[in-house]
């Protein structure tokens, strides 16, 4: 496989007719992977980069899935004594149904394409995790612009680094340990659909956005953080 360019092969999870039981199993295994390979820790690092002291914050996740990231953030905010409200947006109704059963307080769940979501209030922070690689390059530029326009403090992205070591490692691990045909097929493909640092730089350049950082994180993730340059002048609503 050539990792110089992104794969645009469709993931099974993006098909509209996947049975709910299969989606649920997929989400359970992804949560396990995020827990043990540091995915949730990267998300918490992104939150920490954007929070203002202990002021109340509203955090919105686009492509929220079953709400695992939001649960991890809620636990972190509780330890830090940070009052937090959540918005979770997902185009898949099964994901919203699973998220609605999580122990999340003060949350608005929206079944919608993120671009069409009707937000009750402007989020302080918008983020996504393992979401961006589902989109084309052109869609990614528009997504960055949408996140910038709708977040008061800034946004962050936790997504995959396209690399042959990551690809073959996850391919072997999921073949050995996964019980989900979705994970076995989509996990290595997700890496092949992931990004290089140069591609992120190009996306931000085309989007006309500055004041951002791109950090490589184990295991083969990018943490991309944009901070609103006027954050110091923003007061809580």
Where are these regions (language model features)?
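N-terminal, positively charged/glycine-rich alpha-helical extensions of SAM-dependent methyltransferases
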Residues: 1-28
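Conserved beta-strand signature within the Rossmann-like core of class I S-adenosyl-L-methionine
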Residues: 152-160
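Class I SAM-dependent methyltransferase SAM/SAH-binding core
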Residues: 60, 66-116
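Class I SAM-dependent methyltransferase Rossmann-like catalytic core
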Residues: 20-46, 50
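A short, conserved alpha-helix within the catalytic core of class I
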Residues: 135-146
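A conserved beta-strand element that flanks and buttresses the S-adenosyl-L-methionine
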Residues: 127
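C-terminal alpha-helical "lid/dimerization" subdomain adjacent to the S-adenosyl-L-methionine
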Residues: 160-204
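Conserved Class I S-adenosyl-L-methionine
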Residues: 193, 197-228, 237
């Amino acid at each position: 496989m050539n990792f110089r360019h992104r794969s645009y092969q469709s993931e099974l999870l993006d098909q509209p007719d996947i049975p709910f039981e299969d989606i649920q199993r997929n989400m359970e295994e992804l949560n396990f992977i995020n827990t043990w390979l540091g995915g949730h820790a990267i998300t918490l690092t992104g939150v920490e980069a954007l929070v203002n002291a202990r002021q109340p914050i509203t955090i919105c996740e686009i492509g929220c899935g079953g709400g695992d990231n939001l649960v991890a953030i809620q636990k972190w905010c509780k330890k830090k004594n940070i009052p937090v409200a959540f918005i979770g947006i997902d185009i898949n109704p099964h994901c919203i149904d699973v998220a609605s059963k999580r122990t999340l307080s003060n949350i608005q769940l929206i079944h919608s394409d993120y671009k069409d979501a009707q937000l009750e209030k402007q989020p302080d922070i918008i983020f996504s995790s393992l979401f961006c690689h589902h989109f084309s390059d052109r869609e990614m530029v528009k997504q960055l612009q949408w996140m910038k326009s709708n977040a008061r403090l800034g946004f962050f992205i936790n997504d995959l680094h396209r690399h042959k070591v990551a690809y073959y490692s996850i391919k072997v691990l999921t073949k050995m340990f996964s019980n989900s045909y979705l994970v076995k097929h989509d996990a290595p493909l997700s890496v092949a659909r992931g990004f290089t640092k140069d591609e992120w730089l190009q996306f931000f350049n085309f989007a006309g956005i500055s004041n951002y950082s791109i950090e490589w994180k184990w295991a083969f993730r990018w943490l991309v953080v944009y901070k609103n340059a006027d954050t110091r002048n923003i007061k809580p609503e």
